[in-house]
Amino acid sequence: MLEFPQSGERFEGVENFREWRRQYPAALKFHNRRITHRDDLVVVENLISYDGQPWTFIVNVMEFRDDRVAHERIYIMDGWEAAEWREPWRSATRADPPFPEP
């Protein structure tokens, strides 16, 4: 099962998932930032570019059952500039490296 909580969509069954991926109308480029794995739960933090456009943040939350993805939720969001008022408490070290070229 694949879900997009932000749009309310759900895709059930491997064939629906495969066909959705096959029919996707844009060229996608991914840049993996981090993978966190605990027991049967994996969280993947990526950047995604659609048709060479600027990067967008994407988080995949996957639950595994018997070495297969049983349930996946995908969250997609734009980044934003840090608020200036937080600067006095912010570390000089970035949380993540700058974006690569899409």
Describe the role of every protein-language-model region.
Residues 1-102:
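C-terminal and inter-domain tail/linker signature
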